[in-house]
């Protein structure tokens, strides 16, 4: 008999995965590029933050989510099929998100979608722009097809203003994206919603360009694996 394994166990090897760098795809051309920024403290910082969050959760919350996934009928991927499953999902996401401004980043067996704040939200707003709904609709189609993943939605801000305000705004934005995807039929049990405030920048906050990059919401897709 098979069962869903502890999906958070991946944190034990996260350091090795992040150290190996990641592959990203241009948000407009869809062409593959290896990003030095994505290594270490770059784009990978967001994925690393999510992995650390999962690793530090208490056992009761982990077990509760596993029960919720099972109750919702969410299946798991056989160990040998994880790579192919995530490759297929990545290919569809790249196709759907070409020319949208959303970056697709591959980190080992995880996929990270980076949604820049300027196309997702108005300034200081926690509500998704209506103009971004179509992009989220495209994401939802793929998430619905590839349901054997946890969806960690994390909000990030720049360092301008009070840290408490930035924390609240990051939480509101992450919730807003997650709630929209839920409204498109994505199973609630798959979501973890996290606000990181200004703690995990991917660019230098001393420049306007860097601050713009740091204002973002990320979706980290984590495969749900089976064990014998």
Question: Which residues fall in each region the model found?
Answer:
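Amphipathic, membrane-active segments
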Residues: 86-118
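N-terminal Sec signal peptide cleavage junction
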Residues: 20-22
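Bacterial N-terminal signal peptides that target proteins for export
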Residues: 1-11
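Bacterial N-terminal signal peptides
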Residues: 10-18
């Amino acid at each position: 008999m098979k069962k869903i394994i502890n999906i958070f166990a991946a944190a034990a090897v996260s350091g090795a995965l992040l150290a190996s760098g990641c592959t990203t795809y241009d948000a407009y051309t869809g062409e593959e590029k290896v990003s030095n920024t994505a290594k270490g403290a770059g784009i990978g910082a967001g994925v690393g933050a999510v992995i650390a969050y999962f690793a530090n959760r208490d056992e009761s919350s982990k077990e509760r989510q596993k029960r919720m996934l099972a109750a919702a009928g969410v299946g798991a991927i056989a160990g040998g099929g994880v790579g192919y499953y995530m490759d297929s999902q990545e290919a569809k996401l790249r196709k759907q998100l070409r020319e949208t401004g959303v970056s697709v980043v591959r980190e080992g067996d995880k996929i990270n979608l980076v949604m820049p704040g300027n196309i997702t939200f108005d300034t200081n707003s926690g509500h998704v722009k209506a103009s971004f709904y179509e992009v989220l609709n495209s994401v939802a189609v793929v998430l619905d097809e590839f349901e054997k993943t946890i969806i960690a939605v994390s909000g990030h801000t720049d360092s301008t203003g009070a840290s408490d305000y930035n924390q609240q705004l990051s939480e509101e934005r992450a919730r807003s994206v997650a709630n929209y995807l839920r409204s498109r039929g994505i199973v609630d049990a798959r979501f973890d919603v996290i606000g990181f405030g200004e703690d995990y920048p991917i660019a230098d906050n001393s420049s306007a360009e860097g601050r713009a990059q740091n204002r973002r919401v990320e979706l980290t897709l984590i495969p749900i694996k089976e064990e014998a």
